[in-house]
Design a protein with these regions (language model features):
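Luminal/periplasmic acceptor-recognition loop/helix of membrane-associated glycosyltransferases
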Residues: 53-95
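Repeat-unit-sized solenoid/scaffold elements
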Residues: 49-66, 103-108, 121-123
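Flexible, solvent-exposed extracytoplasmic
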Residues: 20-24, 28-31, 89-320
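Short, contiguous strand/loop micro-motifs
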Residues: 5-6, 73-76, 221
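A short acidic, often aromatic-flanked loop/helix-cap motif at beta-alpha or helix-coil junctions
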Residues: 38, 72, 119-122
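Short, glycine/acidic-rich beta->alpha junctions
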Residues: 10-14, 79-82, 90, 219
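Extracytoplasmic
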Residues: 1-61
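Residue-level "edge-of-site" marker
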Residues: 35, 70, 103
């Protein structure tokens, strides 16, 4: 352990400077390799001391491509198939920056930006967190069939021409649409026509907030504006001030239908009301419990009557 600490201390200045630079750059995700599934990758040997650089980047709270400690989201499973030789994969995940050890080779579109000791920082031109796409296929099914479908789509030519099938998961597949089974997606995608088609328009600008993304878009033909963030029903969209439905697009990103014209689109993550109530209750409860232990039985009775009683009633009304 002492040897690990000495090595980490020796490389800490370079990493600190790298992290500071990444925070100063325009918003975008960082690619520093992937955690692999049974095959060798340069990330496996990219360490400072006894800690992987990939893990250090994640613990800094930076927006990363790829998983490390968990794969709860649908997107995180698929990212292990990221192909660093294909520009469309960088664009798909908005992998705008690359961190890699010196000597690691990349395609020409991965441009050197700055070196920090033995760490190289690169930049890739992408469309940002938004893109205008099409969706000519619709699949419905469950999570067990999602990974084979999404990984076959990612390996195909469809991401390169911005063809993103719509996915209806679980109960959502019981809508008026007639989706193909998600279990059939591998075969269907392998036979799908890959064609670019005319321009769909331009994402003129984007703003990134803590729980929101906003874009000004000029659309030339009916399209879906895709936000490169994992789909969840708590994401709410407004187009020109009007609340609009969202859909899930491969590889589990958020899509909003747009007609031709200029539009201002806002997507916000809004936690459910009950979850917020429980979160606030949890924050309030811990210090109040500590006080109740200090003040004794009288405070406990007051706390139960004046605090827990009204909150319990609020939760019951919410369920009712």
């Amino acid at each position: 352990m002492e040897g690990c600490q000495k090595l980490e201390d020796a490389g800490s200045n370079d990493l600190t400077a790298l992290f500071e630079k990444l925070r100063q750059l325009p918003p975008g995700r960082i690619y520093a390799g992937v955690t692999t599934r049974g095959f060798e990758h340069w990330t496996d040997d990219y360490y400072v001391g006894c800690t992987s650089v990939l893990a250090r980047l994640h613990t800094e709270g930076l927006d990363m491509v790829g998983r490390i400690y968990q794969s709860l989201s649908l997107t995180s499973d698929v990212q292990v198939n990221f192909d660093e030789q294909r520009w469309e994969h960088y664009n798909l995940f908005n992998a705008r920056y690359v961190v890699a050890p010196e000597g690691q080779r990349f395609p020409d579109f991965v441009k050197p930006l700055q070196q920090f000791g033995r760490h190289n920082l690169y930049q890739v031109e992408t469309t940002g967190y938004f893109d205008l796409v099409s969706s000519d296929l619709t699949f419905g099914g469950g999570r067990i069939d999602f990974y084979p479908a999404a990984s076959s789509w990612l390996a195909s030519g469809l991401p390169g021409v911005r063809q993103h099938p719509t996915v209806l998961m679980g109960s959502a597949s019981g809508t008026n649409e007639r989706p193909m089974p998600l279990s059939s997606a591998v075969g269907v995608i392998s036979k799908a026509e890959v064609s670019v088609g005319p321009s769909r328009g331009t994402v003129l600008s984007e703003e990134v907030g803590s729980n929101s993304f906003e874009a000004d878009v000029s659309v030339e033909r009916d399209s879906l504006l895709m936000l490169k963030v994992t789909y969840h029903p708590n994401w709410r969209a407004t187009v020109d001030g009007v609340e609009t439905d969202t859909v899930m697009l491969m590889p589990s990103f958020i899509g909003v239908q747009l007609p031709p014209g200029d539009h201002k689109v806002l997507l916000e993550y809004r936690p459910r009301r009950l979850r917020m109530i429980l979160l606030i209750l949890g924050v309030l409860t811990l210090p109040l419990i500590a006080l109740s232990e200090m003040r004794g039985e009288a405070f406990s009775r007051w706390f139960a009557l004046r605090v827990m009683g009204p909150v319990s009633g609020l939760v019951n009304r919410h369920h009712g």
